[in-house]
Amino acid sequence: MANAKEIRGQIKSVKNTRKITRAMEMVAASKMRRAQERMRAARPCAEKIREVLGHLAQAHPEYEHPLMQVRPVKKAGFLVVTTDRGLCGGLNVNVLRNVVQKMRELHEEGVESNLAVVGNKGLGFLRRHGAHLVADVNGLGDSPHLGDMIGPIRAMADAYAKGEVDVVYLVSSRFVNTMLQRATVEQLLPVEKPTASAEQRAELWDYIYEPEARPVLDRLMQRYVESVVYQAVIEHLACEQSARMVAMKSASDNAKRMVDDLQLAYNKARQAAITQEIAEISAGAARFDDCAQHFWKF
């Protein structure tokens, strides 16, 4: 058993660590609330773009945008969203596990994969494992802007439009609640064609376009893909802060339990030391009495 001095040093160290994890927990909670507000603010824009795009596609079925063309899959693209920093539980692990699993399934079918990565954690992992990276971006911070992440988006969209990849998957985390974040693999390209019933088509109305509808559809399709990825990045940021808050709370709770255990061990060590000192004093006193009695005999 360690002596009382060593245990006292361990208690001090764990208490200092707990102060740090508590501070990180509170910071993550504050950032999580702001990230959730950004996520909710971005959602109506993406939904409105999707609504207008669906209306345009149904009103002009004769025009098939290159990003909506379905082809036999010979090569796949992945746009992977991860974090720049760690200490967020298994958030990145779950995302990257999904990427590896999907790539393995495609490889068994003879399909190769290209990857574009958002976030330093995913970039480092995929580089170490020899993945074919075509674009990456990191250092987006806590308030990412669409312009900062446009590189990977354009790389995947252009590759699909040119026929260099035949399908693009978006891999990220979806925010369910503060305690639960779910890693997902969703098809980003080709964009699914909207469907309408006969009654809906009969009631379909149209906008007036100047000079024509095709440039509007082209531009809107590009904005739609960008909005989907931006929404995924914002949502992943909310997941990151939630996971970090939960991880730091767990670390703080574990530190408290460790301090309690160390305090108990310290009390036992101190009690043992005091008991030993009392025993030594008693033994010394008894020895002194024996010597004194022996002395007075003479």
Curated annotation (Swiss-Prot):
Protein name as annotated: ATP synthase gamma chain
Family: Belongs to the ATPase gamma chain family.
One example of a Gene Ontology biological process annotation: proton motive force-driven plasma membrane ATP synthesis
Membrane topology: Peripheral membrane protein
Free-text function comment from the UniProt entry: Produces ATP from ADP in the presence of a proton gradient across the membrane. The gamma chain is believed to be important in regulating ATPase activity and the flow of protons through the CF(0) complex.
Gene that produces this protein: atpG
Molecular-function GO terms, alphabetical: ATP binding; proton-transporting ATP synthase activity, rotational mechanism
GO CC annotations on file: plasma membrane; proton-transporting ATP synthase complex
Pfam families noted in UniProt: ATP-synt
The entry's keywords: ATP synthesis, Cell inner membrane, Cell membrane, CF(1), Hydrogen ion transport, Ion transport, Membrane, Transport
Compartment(s): Cell inner membrane
Phylogenetic classification of the source organism: Bacteria, Pseudomonadati, Pseudomonadota, Acidithiobacillia, Acidithiobacillales
Residue ranges of the TM segments: none
Coiled coil region boundaries: none
CDD domains, alphabetized: F1-ATPase_gamma
Quaternary structure note: F-type ATPases have 2 components, CF(1) - the catalytic core - and CF(0) - the membrane proton channel. CF(1) has five subunits: alpha(3), beta(3), gamma(1), delta(1), epsilon(1). CF(0) has three main subunits: a, b and c.
Organism field: Acidithiobacillus ferridurans
